[in-house]
Amino acid sequence: MSILSSPPLSGDNNVEMNSLSPTFSTLIAPLEAQLPYLTPLASRSNRPLDYTFDFQVRALVYYHTEAFTSAQDLLQAAPEDPLANQLIVPSTGLGESTFYEANVTRGSQQLLELVDRLAKKVSKQLKVPHPALGALVAIDGSLIDASLSMGWAEYTSTRHKAKAHLGFDLNWGLPRQLALTEGNGAERAFVSTFLEPDETGVLDRGYVDYQGFDRWIDEGKHFVARIRKNAHREVLESRPIPPGTALFFFAKVRLGDEAHRMRHPLFLVGFKSRGTIYWLVTDRADLSAEQIAFIFALRWEIESFFAWWKKHLEVYHLISRNPHGVLLQLLAGLVTYLLLVLYFHQQYGERPSLRRLRQVRRQIRQETAIAYLTIYNMDILLALILILGYQRQANS
């Protein structure tokens, strides 16, 4: 299947994206501004690329913005949707094989750079709600259903899944880094990858690693981590517990038994919330027990992000079974989310919400429909004028 470059609009109309949908043009303007600064995408042959990274990333952002459910859904819309046609199809046309080949072989480096650049741009416009707590990064993983044909996505003998590992900036509530592994891929290695010195990783029990704790401290990286209630500990110094709180334990401790004892002491906090007892450790001596508990409570933001991102941007409706293609789609989903954060902040002073997302989708569709009708009527009028002109010439 080949998608023509111009239908349903005439190529002579030369319609700009802003004319088709001012809303979508404004939404992706920060992306367009970053494109010249990304690593150039070079052709692997002597022929220049027609389906460039610019077309590729616009197509993927449009896919998530409009919540298409498959690549076929997007490609079938291109001949009928003038905005999709302009975003996706170069002047030379686009074949299905070219679209799929691009997503499984190229563009990940550019998208990684784009996520980093957009995250930095967004963070400059948002306020830090808790500056005294320092730079906080929640790290977590989310499973993605995979078909049995995706042999690389190992999970169990009967089920295949991939796993997205995410570094989430809790100071600004923004996704920052992403990696992809098979469903049973190790999580702990990404703490060192995602954390910078002087940052504090906020971690659940799956990331507990005594040797890792010592190594992160040696690297100048901090953490607030939940541990199991039966974790072996030696109390080095008891600390006062604030009255009238859910806290019941606060002490300087050393974790591990004789065979697996940590070199560095930690601070252990115990508290009860909604019937559940939590045990948290941190290497940060500057935090109070209440601050330690509060930092861990902020971790729910990464779980809320995963839920909203997956459900409303259709990020896990995969358009590729190839690991590169899956990673590319996840990165494009992060880019789309960051663009929405910027757009909603600039337009309404709000964070992304389903109500505003639906509003944006309605505006894009209405603007595109109006632009299409206007251009279609102009083509008809031009044709009538030409016909009348020919008739007059014939009669004269």
Task: List each language-model region with its residue ranges.
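Single, function-defining residue in the core of a domain
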Residues: 1-73, 77, 104-106, 113-114, ...
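Extended, structured, electrostatic nucleic-acid-contact surfaces
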Residues: 79-89
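Short hydrophobic/aromatic segments of transmembrane alpha-helices and their interfaces
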Residues: 82, 127, 289-290
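Major-groove recognition helix of helix-turn-helix-like DNA-binding domains
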Residues: 87-106
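Short Lys/Arg-enriched helix C-cap and helix-to-coil transition segments
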Residues: 109-122
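A short, well-structured juxtamembrane/interface segment
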Residues: 119-128, 186-188
